[in-house]
Swiss-Prot record:
Species: Methylorubrum extorquens (strain CM4 / NCIMB 13688)
EC number(s) on file: 1.14.99.46
GO molecular-function term, one example from the UniProt record: uracil oxygenase activity
Function per UniProt: The FMN-N(5)-oxide reacts spontaneously with NADH to produce FMN. Requires the flavin reductase RutF to regenerate FMN in vivo.
Protein name as catalogued: Pyrimidine monooxygenase RutA
Alphabetically ordered keywords of this record: Flavoprotein, FMN, Monooxygenase, NADP, Oxidoreductase
One record GO biological process: nitrogen utilization
Binding site for FMN: 61-62, 127, 136, 152-153, 202
EC class (word): oxidoreductase
Family assignment from sequence similarity: Belongs to the NtaA/SnaA/DszA monooxygenase family. RutA subfamily.
Length: 376
């Protein structure tokens, strides 16, 4: 048994799925599966995740795509209405929607969240995003100007304060620079504590998360380097030390698995060979538009040309046993609560994960309840 495996058996890891609310999931490749988003597809994915004992699903919000030959993310559902539908057809799994905070006032989001809390019987939470892609908001006349890049988290801090006040007390009178509440009311309030996710990686994003959020989502890094994200978690730990709050990190990985390492690697190489250069170039241009937030933002990593075919998220490529062992290593990084997974082929990938990968994971023994064979 490796040291990582020994550690993993004593540390349970939560696992969620980043469901494909946009076309083609997270692969900017002509050689990857091509599909449109639909409620039916996301329902099947979410029910499979629930069936296999996974802990949560999250949907993003994307209001304008990257174009290219694959029309990457040009076709997207809306996050809250999708999750409301999923809340009605599931029974156990937790559900997180993403709020585009430049579009939706916080009092409206607080009420929508309370409604889905009612539909789901307390299984709903919220991911807050500031908005980094100017064309998403400029097309609606809602872009506040490029100076916003440097003040995104000041805006989001007031937004989160309004949410917390309404959820916890049913009333907000916040008088801020961006929001002015006047005896704003919310009832009914959520029956369960409403959890907030943030995915900010900049210093300002980390400070916000440590102050207002419950979970921080970050990108994994590299191919089959499952602990390379550790410096990001360390920065959150430093931010948490200033606020004294309990905030755990969740790491985004793409899983590309097959019966053998060689077969999985062949799929990965095939996807890379079909990379949609036009869509990737557009992503790079959008990432360069923010000259105020520093070099450590999510969009900087997404637009890096190293592995832009899957927006540079951490990638786990290998046999089912290889991927299980790599995932067990993730939880060895202190401060890590779990992972958020995407798959090249979501339906098959989830079934393979549930039946062939998860049973081999020491960090998921609390779900499988099985005595595990040694993984080489």
């Amino acid at each position: 048994m490796t040291q990582a495996q020994d550690h993993a058996k004593d540390h349970a890891m939560n696992i969620g799925v980043f469901i494909p609310i946009g076309n083609n999931g997270w692969l900017l490749s002509e050689n990857a599966p091509q599909y449109m988003p639909s409620f039916e597809l996301n329902k099947q994915i979410t029910l499979k995740a629930e069936q296999h004992g996974l802990d949560f699903v999250l949907s993003m919000i994307k209001l304008r795509g990257f174009g290219g030959k694959t029309e990457f993310w040009d076709h997207n559902l809306e996050s809250f209405t999708l999750m409301a539908g999923l809340a009605a057809v599931t029974s156990r799994i937790k559900l997180y929607a993403t709020a585009p905070t430049l579009c939706l006032p916080p009092a409206i989001v607080a009420r929508m969240a309370s409604t889905i809390d009612s539909i789901s019987n307390g299984r709903f939470g919220l991911n807050l995003v500031t908005g980094w892609q100017r064309p998403e908001y400029a097309q609606m006349g809602l872009w506040p100007g490029d100076e916003y890049f440097g003040r995104r988290y000041e805006y989001l801090s007031e937004y989160a304060q309004v949410l917390r006040e309404l959820w916890e007390t049913g009333r907000s009178d916040l008088k801020g620079e961006f929001f002015q509440m006047e005896d704003c009311r919310l009832s009914p309030r959520p029956q369960a504590e409403m959890k907030i996710i943030c995915a900010g990686q900049s210093a300002a994003g980390m400070a916000f998360t440590a102050t207002y959020a419950d979970y921080n989502f970050c990108f994994g890094k590299g191919v089959n380097t499952p602990t390379a994200f550790a410096p990001t978690v360390e920065r959150l730990e430093e931010a948490k030390a200033k606020t004294g709050r309990d905030v755990s990190s969740y790491v985004l990985f793409m899983v590309i698995s097959d019966e053998t390492d060689e077969a999985a690697r062949a799929k990965w190489e095939h996807y890379k060979a079909g990379a949609d250069a036009e869509a990737i170039a557009w992503l790079g241009l959008q990432g360069a538009a923010d000259t105020k937030s520093g070099a450590d933002t999510n969009i900087r990593q997404m637009a890096d040309p190293t592995s832009a075919v899957n927006i540079n998220m951490g990638t786990l490529v290998g046999s089912h046993a290889t991927v299980a062992a790599l995932l067990d290593e993730v939880v060895t990084v202190p401060g890590t609560g779990g992972v958020l997974l995407v798959f090249d082929d979501f339906l098959k990938g989830l079934d393979d994960f549930g039946t062939k990968i998860q049973p081999l994971m020491r960090s998921r023994r609390h779900v499988t309840g099985e005595a595990l064979a040694e993984v080489a």
